[in-house]
């Protein structure tokens, strides 16, 4: 059985993803993907995790753009959700995608034929 906070988190994820495609016009916001949303059990805080393709400067600019749009997003949440209290929003960059791709590249390097040849020579 789902907790209410999980249902709200799913709804926030859908709404913010839709707003990124249709509603936000900030030029600082690049190609953003919402990777997850966590809502506290008391429904007072929603932490939205995102990734963005680009340099570190573009990531920082995107985070600033998202944070400047928090009021607009909360207003849209208030229109869409029937809740007594609309949660505050915090955006956090999700580095797990970069970490996963780095691990994947290391594993590919370990499994490459070139690496296997070096192991045979050392044996």
UniProtKB/Swiss-Prot annotation:
One of its GO terms (cellular component) is cytosol. InterPro entries: KH_dom-like_a/b, RbfA, RbfA_dom_sf, Ribosome-bd_factorA_CS. It is found in: Cytoplasm. The keyword RNA-binding does not apply. Signal peptide: none annotated. GO terms for biological process: maturation of SSU-rRNA. Keywords: Cytoplasm, Ribosome biogenesis. The keyword Lyase does not apply. One of its GO terms (molecular function) is ribosomal small subunit binding. It comes from the Bacteria. PANTHER family: RIBOSOME-BINDING FACTOR A, CHLOROPLASTIC-RELATED (PTHR33515:SF1). Belongs to the RbfA family. HAMAP family: RbfA. Monomer. Binds 30S ribosomal subunits, but not 50S ribosomal subunits or 70S ribosomes. One of several proteins that assist in the late maturation steps of the functional core of the 30S ribosomal subunit. Associates with free 30S ribosomal subunits (but not with 30S subunits that are part of 70S ribosomes or polysomes). Required for efficient processing of 16S rRNA. May interact with the 5'-terminal helix region of 16S rRNA. This is Ribosome-binding factor A. The gene is rbfA.
């Amino acid at each position: 059985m789902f907790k209410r906070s999980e249902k709200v988190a799913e709804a926030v994820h859908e709404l913010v993803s839709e707003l990124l495609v249709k509603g936000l016009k900030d030029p600082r916001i690049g190609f953003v993907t919402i990777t997850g949303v966590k809502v506290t059990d008391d429904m007072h805080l929603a932490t939205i995790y995102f990734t963005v393709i680009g340099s570190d400067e573009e990531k920082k600019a995107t985070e600033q753009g998202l944070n400047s749009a928090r009021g607009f997003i909360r207003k849209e949440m208030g229109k869409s959700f029937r809740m007594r209290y609309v949660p505050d929003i915090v955006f956090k960059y999700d580095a797990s995608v970069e970490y996963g791709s780095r691990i994947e590249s290391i594993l590919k390097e370990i499994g490459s034929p070139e690496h296997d040849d070096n192991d045979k020579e050392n044996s």
